[in-house]
Amino acid sequence: MTNIDAITGSQLMRLWGVSSWIDPGANYYLWDGCCVFAMVKQSGFYDIHVAMDKRRWSECRKAGESILKMFGHHKLRAVIISDRPRVCNYARRMGFGELTIQTLKTVDGRESAFFIMWRDPGEYHGRSN
């Protein structure tokens, strides 16, 4: 896992599927050249955003395990674009719980519906069912 700059991180978020991504002041981490995580510190938790090169989707659990080693001891909120329900399945396997839909204001001031999932602090011990 490599810490990368905001410009590169934002470009990768857009390249790998979040076309409307605007940097919210995140710290970016690149896993094995194919998965970027944007971590945004909030009050008492981190927002976690992820984008991945679709050709290497089969490696998503390894990437998730790596970011959880770094941030799993914090409470995490996964903010997922509402047209990506498969990402919710991935988040569930990484220990994120109950799924809700919330309208949030984005960095550019627009309001959009997102899937929201939470993960309590704790170690990751492999796939959650």
Identify the meaning behind each predicted range.
Residues G97-F114:
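Conserved catalytic-core motifs of GNAT/GCN5-like acyltransferases
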Residues D83-I101:
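Conserved active-site alpha-helix within GNAT-family acetyltransferase domains
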Residues M1-S19:
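Short amphipathic alpha-helix that is part of the acyltransferase structural core
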Residues F71-D83:
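Conserved GNAT acetyl-CoA-binding A-motif
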Residues R55-F71, N89, R93:
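Conserved acetyl-CoA-binding loop-helix of GNAT-fold acetyltransferases
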Residues S20-N27, D32-F45:
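A conserved beta-strand-loop-helix scaffold within acyl/acetyltransferase catalytic domains
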Residues N3, S19-W21, G97-I101:
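Short secondary-structure junctions
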Residues K41-R55, V79:
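Conserved acetyl-CoA binding element of GNAT-fold acetyltransferases
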